[in-house]
């Protein structure tokens, strides 16, 4: 079966929301439209198409990729493909269902809930703990992140460290990450409070001097 790729960068926001009726903010929708052709660069070369209202000009295709595009909401065509979105969530599942893709070809709500757990940034805590416990030089690795459940935890974390980074448990496309030096500002405090209310926690990490990217 041919594959149909779809770029949905609002995926992490949709995961955090959890609803099949999630509506992405306009900025995320514009970002998705601007970069809708991104899957052209990693799609399998054989019998692949990308769901986009933009055309992948052969004049610009210097690598000779065997990829074509079909416009959004082409229900009669979408149902012919195995769909491959950037990420699976309940909203994109509903999108494909509404456009004729057979339910048996889509992940179940239970499977998407598993994806959601794996996408939570708390998984990085276990990952770093694993690396540190097996390293000959654990002091050369960063401290694990801390999951902060209450605003009192947030304030205590800021008081303990000179510079910190706060991250929303589910976020993507460069969003949901804020740096803090010294006292917590009112705006950042408000952001942390909203994230805790919506996502259940906020992740705190010690900020390190950047040496190399």
List each language-model region with its residue ranges:
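Acidic/histidine-enriched active-site and ligand-binding environments that engage anionic O-linkages
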Residues: 157-165
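N-terminal-proximal low-complexity accessory segments that begin disordered
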Residues: 1-41, 45
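Short loop/turn segments at strand-loop or loop-helix junctions that form parts
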Residues: 5-12, 16-18, 53, 88-90, ...
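Conserved N-proximal alpha/beta basic substrate-recognition cap immediately N-terminal to
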Residues: 29-44, 50-156
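Short acidic/polar capping segments at secondary-structure boundaries
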Residues: 90-91, 151, 169-173, 207-210
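Phosphate-binding site of ATP-dependent enzymes
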Residues: 162, 188-213
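Glycine-rich phosphate-binding loop of ATP-grasp-fold ATP-dependent ligases
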Residues: 144, 164-191, 212
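Flexible loop/turn segments at secondary-structure boundaries
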Residues: 13-14, 57-59, 172-175, 210-212
């Amino acid at each position: 079966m041919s594959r149909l790729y779809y770029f949905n960068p609002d995926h992490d926001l949709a995961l955090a929301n959890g609803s099949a009726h999630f509506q992405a903010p306009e900025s995320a929708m514009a970002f998705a439209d601007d970069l809708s052709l991104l899957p052209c660069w990693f799609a399998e070369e054989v019998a692949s198409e990308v769901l986009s209202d933009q055309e992948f000009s052969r004049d610009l295709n210097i690598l000779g990729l065997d990829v074509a595009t079909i416009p959004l909401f082409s229900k009669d065509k979408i149902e012919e493909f195995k769909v491959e979105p950037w990420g699976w969530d309940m909203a994109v599942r509903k999108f494909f269902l509404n456009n004729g893709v057979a339910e048996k070809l889509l992940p179940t709500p239970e499977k998407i809930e598993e994806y959601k757990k794996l996408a939570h940034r708390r998984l990085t805590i276990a990952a770093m703990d694993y690396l540190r416990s097996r390293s000959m030089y654990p002091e050369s690795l960063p401290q694990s992140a801390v999951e902060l459940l209450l605003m009192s935890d947030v304030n205590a974390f800021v008081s303990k460290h000179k510079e910190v980074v706060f991250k929303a448990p589910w976020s993507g496309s460069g969003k949901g990450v804020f740096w803090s030096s010294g006292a917590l500002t009112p705006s950042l405090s408000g952001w942390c409070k909203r994230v805790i209310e919506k996502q259940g926690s906020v992740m705190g990490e010690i900020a390190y001097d950047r040496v190399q990217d």
